């Protein structure tokens, strides 16, 4: 028995920037959902009776929701930010254990002091109570920190076990710089969608798209699923896109 064309699952989504030359196509990564919607305005003409005697469709708004399962900087930049990357980034160093020296100068140099970036706070290891940061001359329960990762504590906290949180820089990975761009500045991209079942592929291509929103919620006992709100519009040839059906049905 031949099954009719149907589809199951979210399919594959590729985005390719159209506002710059020689753009690299990017898979948004483990697509979880793609929900395009065509929504038109219908204007109805009434006479003296209850039901309209004519109707005409006005403007049509085409939007889509994309949900992915990969934190892809390339996809985010292509579909929303349109910015640039620099090599390297920031490493978190959470709860690095240390002991305040028993004698002066009561200083602790963190492990990654050579690439120290920013202080994120200090707590007592035994009670998890936080220290208070001060500019200099700390008293009991206080600390100061230099720009090279040296933490200074009070004599009253000598021999105390502490947990230090800080960031340092790394040369791996990449960092996306989010600039405060002029109004009207946003990347446009082509969206290609593919899904297949029973060796029958359904394909959609939207020539010009822009993202109005990107969000990613971090929840207890759940994965982060980045979401994009996409708006589709016509290209210079006056075409919005095309849908391919593998059979006449």
Question: Where on the chain are the PLM-derived regions?
Answer:
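Solvent-exposed edge beta-strands and adjacent loop segments
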Residues: 1-79, 129-132, 137-142, 201-202, ...
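Extracellular Ig-like/FN3 beta-sandwich strand-entry sites
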Residues: 61, 157-161, 186
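Residue-level recognition of well-ordered beta-strand positions that form the cores
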Residues: 65-69, 165, 192-194, 229-231
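Secondary-structure transition/turn motif
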Residues: 69-70, 111-114, 127, 152-159
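Extended beta-strand solenoid/passenger and fiber regions
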Residues: 73-142, 167-189, 193-202
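Strand-loop-strand motifs at the edges of beta-sheets in extracellular beta-sandwich domains
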Residues: 141-156
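Small/polar beta-strand repeat architecture
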Residues: 154-174
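Protruding loop/beta-arch "assembly-hinge" segments enriched in small, turn-prone residues
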Residues: 221-249
């Amino acid at each position: 028995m031949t099954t009719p064309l149907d589809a199951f699952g979210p399919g594959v989504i590729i985005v390719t920037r159209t506002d710059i030359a020689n753009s690299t196509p990017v898979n948004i990564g483990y697509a979880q959902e793609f929900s395009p919607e065509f929504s038109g305005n219908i204007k109805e003409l009434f006479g003296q009776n209850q039901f309209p005697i004519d109707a005409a469709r006005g403007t049509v708004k085409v939007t889509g929701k994309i949900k992915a399962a990969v934190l892809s900087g390339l996809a985010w930049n292509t579909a929303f930010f349109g910015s640039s990357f620099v090599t390297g980034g920031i490493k978190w160093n959470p709860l690095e254990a240390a002991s305040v020296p028993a004698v002066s100068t009561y200083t602790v140099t963190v492990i990654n002091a050579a690439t120290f970036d920013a202080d994120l706070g200090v707590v007592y290891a035994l009670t998890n109570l936080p220290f208070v940061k001060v500019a200099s001359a700390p008293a009991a329960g206080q600390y100061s920190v230099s720009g090279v990762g040296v933490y200074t504590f009070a004599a009253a906290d000598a021999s105390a076990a502490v947990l230090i949180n800080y960031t340092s820089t790394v040369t791996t990975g990449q960092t996306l710089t989010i600039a405060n761009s002029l109004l009207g500045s946003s990347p446009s991209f082509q969206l290609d969608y593919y899904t297949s079942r029973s060796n029958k592929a359904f394909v959609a291509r939207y020539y010009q798209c822009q993202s109005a929103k990107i969000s990613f919620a971090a929840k207890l006992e759940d994965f982060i699923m980045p979401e994009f709100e996409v708006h589709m519009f016509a290209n210079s040839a006056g075409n919005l896109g095309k849908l391919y059906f593998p059979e006449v049905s």
